[in-house]
């Protein structure tokens, strides 16, 4: 697999389209950090790490509104292995005028656009979530 983060986002997008309660993805440190951001920003209910004597599995519990409205409207991969996209500290993008979240890989770890702006760091723009 050439782009595991794109696979992670696609699995969430596909499960969200058919209103699945949970989705399982192969685990990694980056995916765990992305799941933590999704949870903290209120896009998923929870996630758990399952040990399987290999790389492990992340089980994400998706969140829906009272009338089955999707909380995650869209996920978009920005920086991919063939075309890396970087943003300086003053050029950090806003997603939908601040309604969405940009996930940025910085020297201080994987942060949301708001946290990166507050800490004054730039980095690689991984994805947009809205």
Swiss-Prot record:
The keyword Amino-acid biosynthesis does not apply. This is Small ribosomal subunit protein uS8. HAMAP family: Ribosomal_uS8_B. One of the primary rRNA binding proteins, it binds directly to 16S rRNA central domain where it helps coordinate assembly of the platform of the 30S subunit. Belongs to the universal ribosomal protein uS8 family. GO terms for biological process: translation. InterPro entries: Ribosomal_uS8, Ribosomal_uS8_CS, Ribosomal_uS8_sf. GO terms for molecular function: rRNA binding; structural constituent of ribosome.
């Amino acid at each position: 697999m050439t782009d595991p983060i794109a696979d992670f986002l696609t699995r969430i997008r596909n499960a969200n389209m058919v209103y699945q309660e949970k989705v399982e993805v192969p685990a990694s440190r980056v995916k765990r950090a992305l799941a933590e951001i999704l949870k903290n920003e209120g896009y998923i209910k929870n996630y758990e790490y399952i040990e399987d004597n290999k790389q492990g599995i992340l089980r994400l519990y998706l969140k829906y509104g009272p009338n089955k409205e999707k909380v995650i409207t869209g996920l978009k991969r920005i920086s991919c292995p063939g075309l890396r996209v970087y943003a300086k500290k003053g050029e950090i993008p806003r997603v939908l005028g601040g309604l969405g979240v940009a996930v940025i890989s910085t020297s201080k770890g994987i942060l949301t656009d708001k946290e990166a702006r507050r800490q004054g760091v730039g980095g690689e723009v991984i994805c947009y979530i809205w």
